[in-house]
A protein has these predicted regions:
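Glycine-enriched, solvent-exposed interface loops adjoining structured elements
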Residues: 1-202
Length: 202
């Protein structure tokens, strides 16, 4: 059978497990794998762009944010902001000056920029986006391009639940191989000199 949708995946998991009593738990296995994938993957298919409007140098991160790649002030001329640690930002700008923002940091669920922009010009954030939930969307880019990762990832979670350590280790090894292959492919398809990631998730 093909593996293209959420229903295809849960059917395949049930077939591979050969355990009819686990049907109600199949969505949990998929969800647990997606949580794992969101912690692990940072590839180009996850990149998204959001326009954010700050207020007094503060703006909330997107709800599906995993990590940043670039933050740009969209005034004229556009200016890319540099990342600094929160403690550095506070120490360097104690008087809260106003000017074109030059640096930013992340505290909690917010981006903080300095100097403060009196015009509250929009910021363009290029960031890594969470993998869209397969249960909520039927399919997504990861399922379309790498259904084997979804299958072996969910099987790993299922075998952990059944306390089958030997089989869980087998599927986990295959899952991790696929993670590495996808990460290498993402780097390769960016092109030479374009593989640098500016920062992990703060």
């Amino acid at each position: 059978m093909t593996l293209q949708t959420y229903n295809d995946l849960t059917t395949a998991i049930g077939n591979w497990l050969q355990r009819s009593d686990l049907g109600a738990l199949l969505p949990n296995f998929v969800q647990l794998f997606e949580a794992c994938a969101n912690r692990r993957l940072r590839v180009r298919q996850q990149e998204a762009t959001a326009e954010l409007t700050p207020g007094n140098g503060v703006v909330a991160l997107p709800s599906d944010y995993l990590g940043w790649r670039r933050l740009t002030w969209t005034g004229n001329p556009r200016q890319e902001l540099g990342y600094v640690e929160p403690s550095w930002l506070q120490a360097a700008y104690p008087d809260l000056p106003t000017d074109i923002p030059r640096v930013f940091t992340i505290e909690g669920g917010n981006i903080l920029t300095m100097p403060l922009d009196p015009g509250n010009t929009a910021l363009e954030l290029v960031y890594f986006q969470q993998i869209p939930s397969l249960a909520a969307n039927s399919t997504n880019w990861l399922m379309s391009q790498h259904p084997d990762l979804y299958l072996f990832g969910a099987l790993t979670e299922a075998q952990a639940y059944t306390l089958n350590a030997e089989t869980a280790a087998l599927w986990k090894a295959r899952r991790d191989e696929l993670f590495e292959e996808i990460e290498k492919l993402s780097n390769k398809t960016r092109g030479p000199g374009a593989v640098r990631v500016l920062s992990p998730t703060p």
